[in-house]
Amino acid sequence: MTTKPENPYSALERIFHEPNRLAIMSALCGSANGLTFNELKEECGLTDGNLSRHLKALDEAKVIKIKKAFVSSKPQTTVFLSDTGRENFLEYLVALEGVLKKAALAMALEKKPASLPSILGKIARV
């Protein structure tokens, strides 16, 4: 009996696959202390409303934590990756890397088998 190989696309979680959410999660990965709403808005190039909508979806999925506080008598929202979010996003990135390598390999073989080492070298550097 042969087993069917796992679909590599099944691990691409929809919550992360939207480009703005991918940007938000990527920005948060580099900040152990979280990012303020305004820092995230600037880094990701989003409007207040657009960022709020995506943060709500990520919060409902429990992949981020949102802390609201007053700093110098002004409200401040800070966003952090949750432990689950960090783990799930890393799994997503590994799955995405596998899908991209598979696509690059298919394109290299279709174009010119001799270019395969060059393309795989570029993928490895990313």
Language-model features: locations:
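Short beta-strand "wing" residues that participate in macromolecule-binding interfaces
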Residues: I66
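N-terminal helix-turn-helix DNA-binding core of bacterial DNA-binding proteins
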Residues: N7-N50, A69-V71, Q76-F80
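Basic, amphipathic "hinge/linker" alpha-helix immediately C-terminal to the N-terminal HTH DNA-binding motif
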Residues: V71-Y92, L96
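Short amphipathic alpha-helical "recognition" segments used for binding
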Residues: E43, S52, A114-L116
